[in-house]
Amino acid sequence: MSAADRFRAAARDRDPARAAAEFADDIRLYNPMSAEPLAGRDAVAAALTGLDEVFDDFEHVQVLTDPDPGDAIAETQAVVFRARVGDHTVEGIDLLEVDHHDRIATFTVFARPLSALQALGQAMAARRPSH
């Protein structure tokens, strides 16, 4: 069982701390809400915890695996997901790249539709403490 497999099991169980244990220290999270990636285990873990709090009915619906993606990465999994944010259904793909230390080094999120991403952005912004 690879880091990506363990991550998916933790996500299914809605256990963000266990999921974050599969991240490399220098993981990069690329997401549709920002032009720049989040970097580092703590920042990505915080984002994952926030998503867990705003997503309803999160499920992985399909997994595509490339067990030999090249020299720099040990494994790549494209994980198709579905979730709800309020009245909106989010559909997307988590692209997980596992390094040779069996840790998720790169996590790229592709999601649609725009209305669901806007609802997600509003829900995540509402979680941030105001100054």
Role assignments for model-derived ranges:
Residues M1-H131:
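C-terminal and inter-domain tail/linker signature
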